[in-house]
């Protein structure tokens, strides 16, 4: 979780007010982002686990940021699709993706139109403990990450940087 300070710094550098998080778990990343947001900042947080997000809610409340976080307990594809249907395209400043790896590409394609130009998607675990460079590793998560890394490298819609922070953090900035 060493990259949460990077998330907070990115949010501040972007002047972000409206953010997305795909994959909440215990809320560590969303807490870091919420603390970095201005008083009127918001996070739309997506997760499917009520058990883990209950832990997150306790931390958010204790830190006094629960009012900044709109938790959606539903598959992220549904939430992101609904945001697009509701006319939210181009209105988000920052998104953090750390969820089921085999759906990263689907999430990416739904997140990108939600971002404003200059908005940034931070994608976690892109190095996957080095497995993404091992041609012998062919499990679904590793293959999905390898394919996404290649796709992002060639995607003309973004500017790209892969940072060796924690387990690899890709920054995709919408052009």
Annotate the PLM regions.
Residues 1-175:
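S-adenosylmethionine/decaboxylated-SAM
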């Amino acid at each position: 979780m060493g990259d949460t300070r990077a998330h907070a710094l990115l949010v501040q550098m972007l002047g972000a007010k409206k953010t997305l998080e795909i994959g909440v778990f215990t809320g560590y990343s969303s807490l870091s982002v919420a603390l970095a947001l201005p008083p009127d900042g918001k996070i739309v947080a997506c997760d499917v686990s009520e058990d883990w997000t209950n832990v997150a809610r306790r931390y958010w409340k204790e830190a006094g940021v629960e009012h900044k976080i709109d938790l959606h307990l539903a598959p992220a594809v549904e939430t992101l699709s609904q945001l697009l249907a509701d006319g939210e395209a181009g209105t988000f400043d920052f998104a953090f993706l750390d969820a089921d790896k085999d759906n990263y590409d689907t999430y990416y394609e739904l997140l990108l139109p939600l971002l404003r130009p200059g908005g940034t998607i931070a994608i976690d675990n892109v190095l996957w403990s080095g497995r993404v460079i091992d041609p012998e590793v062919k499990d679904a998560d590793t293959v999905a990450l390898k394919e996404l890394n290649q796709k992002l490298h060639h995607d003309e819609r973004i500017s790209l940087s892969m940072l060796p922070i924690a387990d690899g953090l890709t920054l995709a900035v919408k052009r």
